Amino acid sequence: MEPYAGKAKVPRRKAKLRIPREDFIAESDAESYAIAIDPSGKLTWKSNAIEGEHVITVISERVSDDYLAFLQSKGVSYLFGGRADIDLSKVLVKLRKHFGIRKLLLEGGGRINGSFLAADLIDELSVLIAPVADGSIGTPTLFDVEAQRGPARNLRLISVQKLKGDVVWLRYKI
C-alpha cells in the first residue's frame, strides 16, 4: 500500500479537542475496497481511492488525533482494530458490519499473511509460481510470523493450472 500513500507529514491540527476513538465510515457503498493495515498511522494517503477502490485503513487506538483528522479530511474510512495490536478477527467483523464485506483477497506480504494464518482466518491459498530463481538469502517467505506460531497447517490441493510464460497456479484449501 505504501506506493499509493504520499511521504508528506501529517498536518498539525489547530483544534486541540481529542478525537474519539470510534470507527469513521466515509463511504459504505463502494463497488470495492482497498484495505490497509496501518497500526501506527504512517500512511499519508494522496486520496481516498486506489484505482477506483475506496480506502479503508485499519489502525490502533494509539494513532495521533492529527492522523485521524488527516484521514477524515481525505475521506478515508478507518476502523480501530485494537488498543496497540490489531485483532484481525474483530476487524473482519467490522468490515462485514460497516461495509458488507464477506470475502477478502489478501494481497499482503509475509507478515500480514502470517498474521492472518496465525489467527486461523485463511480458508484458501492461491499461489503463482514463476519460473525464476534468484538464490537470495533473507527473502521474505509467504508466511512470516513473529509471535509464537501455531501448528503447521495441512493444505488440500484444489487445482493446478499452467498459465502463459510457464507460470503455475496452485490453489489449496486450508
Q: Where are the language model's segments positioned?
A:
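Enzymes that bind and transform nitrogen-containing heteroaromatic metabolites
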Residues: 1-174
